[in-house]
Amino acid sequence: MKEIDKYAGKNILVLGLGRSGFAVSKLLLKLGARLTLNDKADLAADPKAKQLADLGVRVIGGSHPVDLFDEEKFDYLVKNPGIPYENPMVAKASEKGVPIITEPEVALSASESPYVCVTGSNGKTTTVMLTQQIMDHYLQKQGHHAYAVGNIGWPISEVVLNQAGPDDLLVVEMSSFQLMGVTDIEPKVAAIVDIYNNVHLDYHKTFDNYVDAKLNVGRFQKTSDYFLANFDQKDILAREEKATKAKILTFSENDPVADFYIGQDYLMHGEEKMMKIADIKLPGIHNLQNSLVAIGISSLMGAGKDDIAAVLSTFTGAEHRLQYVTTLDGVKVYNDSKSTNIEAATVAIQSFKQPEVLLAGGLDRGFVFDSLVDLFKKHVKAIVTYGETRYLLADAARKAGIKTIVVVDNLHEGVKAASKLAEAGDVLLFSPACASWDQFKTFEERGEYFVKYVKELEEK
């Protein structure tokens, strides 16, 4: 941890006692701040709340008392990224002119380790995991490590406080929720894998707001830093060029004009062959793109082709992201629960040459699934739909001419139905194309239940 004066002696309100709220509170205490922690949940029996109270934090649970801002002056409000800006406490802080920041900004300002940041609508977690493993392979030769932190599930504050040293590297996954509140981060390399519409618009309200939040990943970089941009998304690229001072390098699915691109047989950096495509374990063109971005970041940070090959030739996927689960009677089963929108489902469905039995459905967020019709025609032999969107997806399947369409209420029934339809040589693909919140708390929980139900079939 780097000693900084920014938060020393400051009166700070931390909003939300999740894992990141707990971690950033401990870091801020170490940096000399005075803390109040507030969560609308009852914290009377919460062990984390007790631990913070024992360290001198004023803990207030059970409500969001906006009159706190009338009782005393706060220098900062550190909010959980998932808490919307319409929250009464956040709105009151804004009204009072209190700077509103999030955990990543606090943690990265105190990091003595250099860091790189990755964001995007789809693919950021896989890209972060690949980058972390490549860089760890490289750094271990020197006795150091790379850590995958941030939106991937490990609070940056926790690693900055307890693990990472000056010769280590933080590979940071950042969501649009985290980036929206950022006012000062400077990654050595920033990357935006892709940006699609219809993602988190319930939080950001407009697509422009969503893009602006994503662009914060490189907005505060210097000319000595690097920014990796998707050459194939020209409208976004134009905005990236205006947003960052860093040197922009581009990547593309097939255009050799880009700095990094997917060639005929190799992932390329200019004329240099970086990795043989046939040796990459992850399926799908989108994972070649994720691999390409990881290669770009890692090579800029010093890793060699031996480090890249060691990881890409063995890495089989992140949980819930086109994750291979098992083979049932000759049917390969994949868990793509992270597919919470149409774009993510599209890349998953396109990833296989074998006939697919698709299991899809979930929360109805107003998506129109007609854009999947042509894709269904080319790849899907049968479909099982469930959840709030079951009839909408079934209707799209009918338009595609799919003859075998099964509509069920829940995921458990869906797994059983899909397994009966799939034959040896097929792929059973769970790619919901919808958020999980109609029946599950998170896409991770949804994916865990999918794997559980598949394993139950395997044991019969």
Swiss-Prot record:
User: Which family is this protein grouped under?
Assistant: Belongs to the MurCDEF family.
Q: Which organism is it from?
A: Lactobacillus delbrueckii subsp. bulgaricus (strain ATCC BAA-365 / Lb-18)
| Annotated GO biological process | cell division; cell wall organization; peptidoglycan biosynthetic process; regulation of cell shape
- Enzyme Commission number: 6.3.2.9
Principal place where this protein is found? Answer: cytoplasm
Function in brief: Cell wall formation. Catalyzes the addition of glutamate to the nucleotide precursor UDP-N-acetylmuramoyl-L-alanine (UMA).
Keyword annotations from UniProtKB, A to Z: ATP-binding, Cell cycle, Cell division, Cell shape, Cell wall biogenesis/degradation, Cytoplasm, Ligase, Nucleotide-binding, Peptidoglycan synthesis
Instruction: Kindly state which reaction or reactions the protein catalyses.
Output: UDP-N-acetyl-alpha-D-muramoyl-L-alanine + D-glutamate + ATP = UDP-N-acetyl-alpha-D-muramoyl-L-alanyl-D-glutamate + ADP + phosphate + H(+)
**What is a single cellular component term in the Gene Ontology annotation?**
cytoplasm
Which pathway does the UniProt entry assign to this protein?
Cell wall biogenesis; peptidoglycan biosynthesis
Q: What is this protein called?
A: UDP-N-acetylmuramoylalanine--D-glutamate ligase
Query: What does the entry list as the binding residues for ATP?
Result: 120-126
The gene it comes from is murD
Q: Does the keyword Iron-sulfur apply?
A: no
- What NCBIfam families does the record point to? murD
Keyword Chaperone recorded = no
Subcellular location field: Cytoplasm
Source domain of life is Bacteria
Q: Which GO terms describe its molecular function?
A: ATP binding; UDP-N-acetylmuramoylalanine-D-glutamate ligase activity
